């Protein structure tokens, strides 16, 4: 899996007719990924973490705070919105050319790899074995917060 495929899956497999119910939106993606290998599920997770990490900057946080008071969590969930709106949208957010992003959240995408893995192995998603190399938490991209 690569970034292109990552964004294709989000745009083509998620049920966007269910907008407003994020769990329903991601349900088809969870089912789809659960039919792939663990390596593919983990790759999806790693790509998601990398993309979120790349948006984790002091500049973006300041931009976001112009639109409403962001906490560490809400800033993460707003970064998730950039992912679920496709690659072109993501790149605009990354370049600082789409500030509307900071008024929305899409936390549900974070659970997709864990839910898919749990479904595949008939296990609790809390037993998910991967910890991505890049942290998604706000402030993790230390170089971009200086």
Where are these regions (language model features)?
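Basic, alpha-helical nucleic-acid-binding regions used in initiation and control of genome expression
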Residues: 87-92, 96-146
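N-terminal, charge-rich interaction modules
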Residues: 1-33
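Core of folded catalytic or high-affinity ligand/protein-binding domains
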Residues: 31-103
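Broad hydrophobic/π-residue packing in well-ordered secondary structure
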Residues: 1-6, 48, 77, 82, ...
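Alpha-helix initiation and N-capping motif
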Residues: 3-4, 22-26, 45, 75, ...
């Amino acid at each position: 899996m690569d970034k292109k495929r990552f964004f294709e899956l989000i745009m083509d497999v998620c049920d966007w007719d269910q907008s407003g119910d994020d769990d329903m939106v991601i349900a088809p993606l969870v089912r789809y990924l659960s039919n792939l290998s663990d390596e593919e599920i983990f790759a999806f997770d790693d790509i998601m973490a990398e993309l979120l990490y790349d948006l984790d900057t002091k500049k973006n946080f300041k931009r976001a705070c112009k639109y409403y008071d962001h906490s560490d969590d809400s800033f993460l969930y707003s970064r998730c919105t950039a992912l679920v709106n496709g690659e072109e949208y993501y790149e605009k957010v990354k370049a600082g050319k789409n500030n509307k992003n900071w008024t929305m959240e899409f936390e549900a995408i974070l659970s997709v790899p864990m839910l898919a893995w749990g479904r595949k192995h008939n296990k609790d998603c809390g037993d998910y074995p991967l910890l991505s190399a890049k942290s998604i938490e706000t402030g993790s991209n230390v170089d971009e917060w200086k």
